């Protein structure tokens, strides 16, 4: 009876020992960049790999094969990817890709690379000579497949639970979570509509991404239409916004807005590419943009109190971005006509911050263009986030003209400016914890009826604290805020006027103080604000 158990123990030990071998330490890789002049890097050399302590490092190579001529594209270090585990040689196995890619483990293992497509024919099985089977042989041949299969299942489950998706793949479980999240958002009930399954069509070409490995790293946000990932594109971080297929219309709308002539601006989110990934029912639609590590203005204000100069910088660059978005530019930098665009979901969550706190406008999924001689497209009235909806939107009494939509954006800007002031330490008084507009009045999840009662019927607005008005700059800014969220839409300021006012207020205050606390109320009148004739 001991022989079977001894054989089983021997077999299991050999399997475990085999799994412990093969992991080669990767410290350095061969480096090469065919686009070194354009990207301002070295052309070739050695690259030292750096990563997290519990992550594995690899080397990779990518190349083209044009009629038998090998054209090297990239070589270097590659992050933790289970497709590269225990590969001592750099071998590409795809049949006929546009760009070949291989990865391996071990120092300088990418010095040599090769293409070896997986064989399509049946495997050749070794048949031992017909001998009388012994008990040990029967046990070995019976338990070997079972043990190997068990190890594979356990390893696959562990990888699924602990590893990030490799290049070109997305965790479907995460995507379904995004879809469920999108259906529960604080917005209009009709903002999440399933669409019939159909191919969204080819996205515009994105050669920048097509030639470079893209690796998803972690989910940074869940929004109206899906998830936003932090990803790595070679040595740069990018943001990847992933839409499920039923939100194809939002993906197409945002892609079209980004593709509009003149959309390259320092205060608008930089667009990199739009792509379709997957097939059949697992199709995903990707928007790839610049990544900003400080995140949204909402997140930043939750964790940080800001100075007077920081407030002015964010407010000025934010209003500059919205002013440019609203502007109609007949001939923009040789790109063609840039039409006026209304954002329609302006809020602090959709304002991102660069490292120097320069504001960048994002999320153009609900934006609408106003081109001469063309209908503006879907101008459904009640869209956006409820608590930022203007009174006329809550009432359903919108004039479907360009200026009406721009004034709706300006009401929301007034609320975002209030959020900035509420977290500024310039005034001589306490700085409260961060709160969303109307959170103090009607909580974190207001209904449409509650907002109609507070905003439309009672004409209430977020509270302006008395001690804010004792600082000359904040007092003038509060006047500007009140003129942005005016109940009369036609009386609201334009984004360009807000930008000019903030600049003027900052210069006037900083001309006499250096971000210090000023308590003279009379000094508020020292600077004349721009007249309301500057409104839209």
Curated annotation (Swiss-Prot):
E.C. code: 2.7.11.30
Residues spanning the signal sequence: 1-18
Disulphide linkage map: 29-59, 49-77, 84-103, 90-102, 104-109
SUPFAM superfamilies hit by this protein: Protein kinase-like (PK-like), Snake toxin-like
Enzyme class at the top of the EC tree: transferase
Region (Interaction with DYNLT1): 515-536
Coiled-coil spans in chain: none
Places the protein is found: Cell membrane
Membrane topology (Extracellular): 19-137
Glycosylation sites: 42, 65
Single GO cellular component term: receptor complex
Residue ranges of every copy of the Protein kinase domain listed in the record: 214-504
Cofactor field: Mg(2+); Mn(2+)
Any one Pfam family match given in the protein's UniProt record, by short name: Pkinase
Keyword match Signal: yes
Binding site for ATP: 220-228, 241
Oligomer and partners: Forms an activin receptor complex with activin type II receptors such as ACVR1B. Interacts with VPS39. Interacts with DYNLT1. Interacts with BMP3. Interacts with BMP2. Interacts with BMP6.
Official protein name in the record: Activin receptor type-2B
Species per Swiss-Prot/TrEMBL record: Mus musculus (Mouse)
